[in-house]
């Protein structure tokens, strides 16, 4: 497993965008570039800034299709205007965006000895 972000050209007009997330796993998105539009399959995590990778490949308008509603597939959706997600997965997306679900995920990281650093908001005047 490559431990870096990269764009891999699979064939003419088809690309894999690899994102190495939190030092523990790769997540992937796929871009298919047509003559008038491009189709992005999944958008990884919201922190990815996946649009910057897409813009390195094409300037065409981009439609997004999510394979399912888990946050590692829909996290970057807000960077795009047209998103396709099944109705059933809309509810899943909500569950996976829930604070308690995210808290459970972080707890799982800690159990596996993954370093989790907490940020605190400190007001200064």
For each predicted feature, which ranges?
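Short N-terminal signal/transit or membrane-insertion segments
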Residues: 4-21, 97-113
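Conserved beta-strand hairpin/beta-sheet module of binuclear metal-dependent hydrolase folds
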Residues: 5-55
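Active-site HxH/HxHxD metal-binding segment of metal-dependent hydrolases
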Residues: 47-125
